[in-house]
A protein has these predicted regions:
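Bacterial Sec-dependent N-terminal signal peptides
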Residues: 1-24
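The feature marks proteins involved in alpha-glucan
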Residues: 23-37, 68-145, 150-163
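Carbohydrate-binding surface patches
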Residues: 34-44, 570-617
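Conserved, mostly hydrophobic/aromatic
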Residues: 40, 92, 146, 187, ...
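Beta-strand-rich binding/interaction modules
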Residues: 40, 46-59, 63, 611-628
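Conserved alpha/beta catalytic core and glycan-binding cleft of carbohydrate-active enzymes
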Residues: 114-117, 121, 338-339, 347-509, ...
């Protein structure tokens, strides 16, 4: 056994008594060379009705040993098997079907049987020296949402381990990510999920993975050998370690809000109906839109989530958590997770989707909805206010907004620019979705314009802006306009307060051929179009320079609401004659002495198809961004109190 791990676990348990209780509840398999202990928390199981079966194979064959577990108190059942069982497999059965348990840490192929492993054997060389990349504030993060398979499955990727964890350890992949400048990867589900058959990997299969089966085991289809329980664990750790060495944090997509199904789930086969919410009519509630919703407010489900988060931090060195449909979970549980994580490392960032996918069987005011985020200190949420102000409403792919040159969402964008805080110059009555500020500090807002859900940015722009697909316009002109609008969209994201987030591949104008939700689309839709790096080199260069500009200038990364209100002031949109102009938003970051090398910054977004003039504080300025080009050393100089902003572009000026 790993003595260092045991010491750390003991110290952590002494600090976190709640977690210790959870460890006792969910530590279902304890291995040593001399014996293996099995414990299952199954409160509703009848007398002598819990069976454990041992197998020599992770999928095939009959059990070579079957044991009746003995009751240990009111809720737990136990059994001890002498001898070295490493390499064997097991299942529990309370009469509802075999299960590897609720908290299996290793499994056979397809996750139907638990695996007996020594986790120390899964640590790659140097794992004990792996270090979490440092950040001073969540605002320092540049989050890159990535699907493991998408990144490398195309033969044009030039990577050896196509579609695998190990692709992210290859020098070419690491160099690409470092060159782009991102410092955090939010991986779409990497836990063991049910929607890909790991025994049929010779056939192309794709799924996003929001179909949880075993929450605490890495997905096997991304490993080089899903039949080997330790391989997926070790290769996942190798990926994490390689990214950490490159200065890139790893964020886990936590999908605790539902399971793939109910009757076949490990929860249901261990403690029937406990882990799920039901309606007043006795039906399973479906706030997830996936057929069920879990009951985070129940003590055992809350303990499970706490212990699972802690396990991914301790065993896999995870640096952050994105909670899928966070609005299904209760506020108290989410705050308990934040407080526990703070005691481990407060720099571990937690954020989520502040909504559900349907009505939940729990009071809305007690759920971790975006509107309740002010009660979740230190937990972020996605700003759909900002997203839809730019691209258009989620309900209609073909309807545009500011990026289409359509007025009406200027205040919604301004609300996103300040990071979702209360600001005297933001008229909340004109904000699209929220009429009250929902963050305490800008670091609780995820600023973005697209993610894996719905159309990717390029497809959405083409669907909502007719000129981008009008064959009467030359392809050269359509491409030039697409580039302008795409760059303008991301400039809004990266020069706003909050935590910037992009969908992986957007830096190369990735598209998904117009597919609205590509959760089970083939690789031809989801894979990176690596040839685009040669086709649109200016896109990658712009993204890279935009990311670096944000990293170089703390003024775009203010960490508190008070600092934003003190330093960020919106500019009037009227022209020199006092006429109001639409689709034009500008602001200044002022009095930046001691904060930024640039003492005064002006940022203007022009969503119109015509050049616009805007009034600015009179002075001499250096141009850092203009017409889709960024150069912090300066593209030229401007003097006076009025500037021209090119069509569909951003202008960034500064004074030293």
């Amino acid at each position: 056994m790993n003595i260092q791990k045991l010491i750390i676990a003991a110290l952590t348990a002494s600090i976190l008594p709640t977690s210790l209780s959870a460890q006792q509840t969910f530590n279902e398999m304890m291995y040593s060379k001399e014996k293996t202990m099995f414990v299952l928390n199954a409160p509703t199981a009848g007398k002598s009705s819990v069976t454990i079966r041992l197998y020599k194979d992770g999928q095939k064959g009959k059990a070579y040993k079957t044991l009746k577990m003995k009751k240990m108190g009111d809720e737990r059942w136990g059994a001890t098997v002498k001898g070295d069982l490493k390499g064997k497999f097991y299942t529990f059965d309370i009469g509802k079907g075999e299960t590897p348990g609720t908290f299996a840490k290793a499994v056979g192929v397809n996750g139907n049987r638990g695996a007996i492993v020594d986790l120390y054997d899964t640590d790659p060389v140097g794992w004990d020296k792996d270090v979490r990349p440092a950040i001073q504030s969540p605002a320092d993060l540049v989050i890159y949402e990535l699907h493991v398979r998408d990144f490398s499955i195309s033969p044009t990727s030039g990577l050896k381990y196509q579609g695998k964890y190990l692709a992210l350890t290859e020098p070419k992949a690491i160099e690409y990510l470092k060159n782009l400048g991102i410092n955090a990867i939010h991986f779409q589900p990497v836990f063991d999920y049910a929607s890909v058959d790991e025994t049929q990997l010779n056939k192309p299969q794709f799924n996003w993975g929001y179909d949880p089966k075993n929450y605490n085991v890495p997905e096997g289809s991304y490993s080089t050998d899903p039949y080997s329980p330790g391989t997926r664990i070790k290769e996942f750790k190798e990926m994490v370690m390689a990214l950490h060495k490159a200065g890139i944090r790893v964020i886990f997509d936590a999908v605790y809000n539902h399971t793939f199904d109910i009757n076949g789930s490990n929860f249901q086969r261990t403690y029937p109906d406990y882990y799920y919410r039901k309606t007043k009519e006795g039906k399973y509630s479906d706030g997830s839109g996936c057929g069920n919703e879990t009951a985070s407010e129940k003590p055992l489900m809350r303990q499970f989530m706490l212990e699972s988060v802690k396990y991914w931090i301790d065993e896999f060195h995870i640096d952050g958590f994105r909670f899928d449909l966070m609005g299904v979970h209760d506020i108290e549980t989410m705050q308990a997770i934040r407080e526990m994580v703070n005691r481990i490392d407060p720099s571990i960032y937690i954020y989520g989707e502040g909504w559900s996918a349907g009505s939940c069987a729990y009071p809305t005011e007690k759920l971790a909805m975006k509107a309740n985020t002010h009660q979740l200190n230190g937990i972020g949420a996605f700003s759909d206010d900002m997203r839809d102000a730019l691209r258009g409403p989620f309900s209609d792919d073909h309807k545009g907004a500011l990026l289409a040159g359509l007025p009406g969402e200027e205040e919604s964008l301004k609300f996103g620019i300040v990071g979702g805080i209360a600001h005297p110059q933001v008229d909340m009555t004109k904000v699209n979705y929220d009429k009250k500020p929902w963050t305490n500090n800008p670091t609780e807002q995820i600023s973005y314009v697209s993610c894996h859900d719905d159309m990717c940015l390029v497809d959405r722009l083409k669907a909502s802006i007719p000129s981008l697909t009008d064959k009467k316009i030359s392809e050269e002109m359509r491409t030039a306009e697409l580039l302008r609008i795409d760059q303008l969209a991301q400039t809004c994201v990266f020069t706003s307060q909050g935590v910037p987030f992009i969908l992986a591949g957007e830096e190369m104008l990735r598209d998904k051929k117009g597919v609205h939700n590509s959760f089970n689309s083939p690789d031809s839709i989801n894979q990176f179009t690596w040839i685009n790096l040669q086709k649109y080199p200016q896109a990658f260069t712009f993204y890279k320079n935009l990311i670096q500009l944000r990293k170089n200038h703390p003024a775009f990364r203010l960490s508190t609401g008070d600092k934003v209100r003190q330093h960020l002031e919106f500019l009037p949109s009227q022209d020199a004659n006092g006429n109001k102009q639409t689709c034009l938003v500008g602001f200044q970051l002022k009095s930046l002495e001691g904060i930024d090398a640039w003492k005064h910054i002006v940022v203007i977004y022009n969503f119109n198809k015509q050049t616009k003039k805007m009034q600015i504080p009179e002075g001499n300025y250096t141009v850092a961004c203009c017409n889709g080009v960024i150069n912090e050393e300066g593209l030229g100089f401007i003097s006076g109190k009025e500037v021209e902003v090119a069509p569909q572009s951003a202008l960034i000026l500064y004074q030293k």
